[in-house]
């Protein structure tokens, strides 16, 4: 059996609020293999967003280990985590987080700038991914010229553009049309 794509062991995440410590994640163990689809479900306040932030390398655990694609990311510094996020993780946010005065093509190509691709490589790959989500005819439109479902598909295309190891999506089908 191949190494898991994600392996977290005894992950804990605490937050200090004034004089109080809030124990949000209390020793989570999880393994996700390549090709698996996993849904995090639970009531509000159960720690889903906190776990997603840890899995997405947007936060680090209070304790425990997180191995992502063979690399221990649990103790990495911010600049190392930024590189991991750009290369390994695609995000689809519930609110899309698209740049409002930027075309769909440029919104999708944005992560490739940070990955060091040339403008021609960015445009070619972003065009390819926008075609995959059936938005070839809307590439030059800004977000306010797109429906909610089209904006969601731009966000999905942006998550896919760097060919990440994992996709983290917050309610990814909530606005599709």
Language model segments and positions:
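ABC family nucleotide-binding domain
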Residues: 4-177
């Amino acid at each position: 059996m191949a190494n898991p794509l994600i392996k977290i062991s005894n992950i804990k995440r605490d937050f200090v609020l004034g004089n109080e410590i809030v124990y949000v994640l209390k020793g989570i163990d999880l393994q996700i293999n390549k090709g698996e689809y996993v849904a995090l479900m639970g009531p509000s306040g159960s720690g889903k967003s906190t776990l997603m932030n840890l899995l997405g390398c947007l936060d680090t655990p209070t304790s425990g280990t997180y191995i992502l694609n063979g690399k221990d990311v649990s103790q990495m510094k911010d600049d190392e985590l930024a590189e991991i996020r750009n290369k390994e993780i695609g995000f689809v946010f519930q609110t899309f987080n698209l740049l409002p005065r930027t075309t769909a093509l440029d919104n999708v190509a944005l992560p490739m700038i940070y990955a060091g691709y040339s403008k021609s490589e960015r445009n070619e790959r972003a065009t390819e991914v926008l075609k995959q989500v059936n938005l070839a005819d809307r590439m030059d439109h800004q977000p306010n010229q797109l429906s909610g479902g089209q904006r969601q598909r731009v966000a999905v295309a942006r998550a896919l553009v760097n060919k990440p190891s994992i996709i983290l999506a917050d309610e990814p089908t909530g606005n599709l049309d």
